Amino acid sequence: SHDNDGGLVLICNSGTYHGAGNQGSAVQYNVSINDAIRPRATRSGIFSANIHIAGPCKNTLVQRNLLHVNPKTEPFIDRSIITSDSWDGYADSTVFRENVFFVPQESEIRLNRSTRNTFDGNYYLGNIKGRPEDPNGRNASDYYNQCISKDPSGFNSLSFLFDTVIIGDGSAVLKAVNRDTIHRFFEMMKEE
């Protein structure tokens, strides 16, 4: 995803709904470039987390995603990488594993009253307030710096992760993450 006002993903569950809810969701192998850039107010104010977990979601896995945040164009634009908040309840047992969080400006992780969050082996590349305990977390990556050295915006420098897909008669063309390449990318991140 790129240039999405609302961020990469919304994982949600209304706490007032009495059905099965949102249990066991997985968000993995996504690439987000310059998302979470909403410049206008929503009903809850200026808000646009890259990863937003709303309500009592259970056993969510957020693994091996690349979030490349570019500088926000206005000082009032939300700078949260992750926000877990209430929708008549809070998330429980969310695992964040081996994600890359690249931020050129101070950003924040807001877990609020969510419970039993696990962070393991994530890359915190930049100044991130509210960083949770992550025993295998890293603050630097020479490999990632090398990847983006020619284009810090990420658009061209991370293009090797994508395939061009032509839809139908060619009236639509899109970029899709190449499965093998994104797997290799995360293996290279671990090898340094």
Task: Locate predicted features.
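Alpha-helix capping and helix-loop boundary segments enriched in small/acidic/polar residues
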Residues: Y17-N22, I53, W87
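A structural motif corresponding to the C-terminal lobe/cap of the Radical SAM core domain
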Residues: V100, E108, Y143-Q146
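Short glycine/acidic-rich loop motifs that flank beta-strands on beta-rich extracellular proteins
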Residues: D3-C12, A20, A36-A49, G55, ...
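Right-handed parallel beta-helix
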Residues: S1-G7, A20-R38, K58-P71, D92-V103, ...
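Surface beta-loop-beta hairpin patches that serve as ligand-binding interfaces in beta-rich domains
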Residues: P132-E192
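Glycan-recognition and catalytic regions of carbohydrate-active enzymes
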Residues: S86-G89, Q146
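Active-site rim elements
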Residues: S84, P104-R110, L161-F162, G170-L174
